[in-house]
Structures are given as structure tokens and as C-alpha cells.
Regions:
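Periplasmic/extracellular, small/polar-rich flexible segments of pilin-like filament-forming proteins
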Residues: 30-143
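Amphipathic alpha-helical segments typified by the pilin-like N-terminal helix
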Residues: 1-22
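N-terminal alpha-helical signal peptides/signal-anchor transmembrane segments
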Residues: 17-36
């Protein structure tokens, strides 16, 4: 029973991280669409600002830097030291993922990447069950 509770609690953290990060990226994308300056966190944890408009690729990099800099981590054990943050497969310099985190050991990991020229995808690895990875995915419009 305890392991079931722990498993449920870890999944709840993954869902919470996905929701929090999706809301943050979505709100910053909306502000960017109207030309606002955007506050973000650099990968080393310092606060900074960028001016809009920016390319979708640069916006995604700023968002990935923010997730890394805010020190989000997976609630699961980290399989490899290079996977030091929720959104990287290389710790230093940060190696951000360009697709959903598909490795079975990437439970709780999240990626932010370009879905197409006007859409950003936020994707979390919720669980690995019956030989398949289960994802939580959200799309964010980027104008």
C-alpha cells in the first residue's frame, strides 16, 4: 500500500510541474505576443529580461533556461548524474531535449520544444507501464 501511495504522490508532482510550467510558458508567450519585455531566469539562476518579439527558438531557449535555473527536478531517482535537472540530458552546459522525454528512466522529466513554427509543446514523462511511456502534453500558441 505504501508503494502505491508513493507512486501516486510522485505522479502528482509530475502533473503539478507540468501544469505550473505550462501556465508559466503560456503566460510569457502571451506577453511576448503583445511586445512586452519578459522576465526569465538564466540557467545559472540569475534573473534577467529579454525583449519581444523573438523567434520561437529563442523563446524556447529562454523558457528552458528558466526551468533549469529555477531548479525543477524529477520526483523520481535520477538515473544518471548528467540528468541533473528536469529538462536536460546533459547538465553542463545544459542539453535541452527537442522531443518528449522517452527514455524509461526519464520518469518525471519534462521538455519544452518547437512543435511547429507557431506552437510550443510542453511534454512530461508521467510513467512507464506495460512497456510504454505515458506522457502529459500541452500545446501553447506562439504568435
Amino acid at each position: 500500500a505504501y508503494s502505491g501511495y508513493t507512486s501516486g504522490a510522485k505522479k502528482a508532482v509530475v502533473k503539478s510541474n507540468q501544469a505550473t510550467i505550462t501556465k508559466m510558458v503560456g503566460s510569457k508567450a502571451a506577453l511576448c505576443a503583445v511586445g512586452e519585455a519578459i522576465d526569465y531566469t538564466t540557467f545559472n539562476g540569475t534573473k534577467s529580461t529579454f525583449s519581444c518579439p523573438v523567434s520561437i527558438d529563442n523563446f524556447i531557449k529562454y523558457m528552458n533556461d528558466t526551468i533549469y535555473g529555477l531548479d525543477f527536478k524529477s520526483p523520481y531517482d535520477v538515473a544518471y548524474p548528467s540528468w541533473c535537472k528536469i529538462n536536460v540530458t546533459n547538465c553542463s552546459p545544459p542539453g535541452y531535449m527537442s522531443a518528449c522525454p522517452s527514455h524509461p528512466d526519464q520518469l518525471g522529466y519534462l521538455s519544452i520544444f518547437k512543435h511547429n513554427n507557431t506552437t510550443i509543446k510542453v511534454c512530461s514523462n508521467l510513467e512507464y507501464t506495460s512497456g510504454k511511456t505515458v506522457y502529459i502534453e500541452n500545446l501553447i500558441s506562439f504568435e
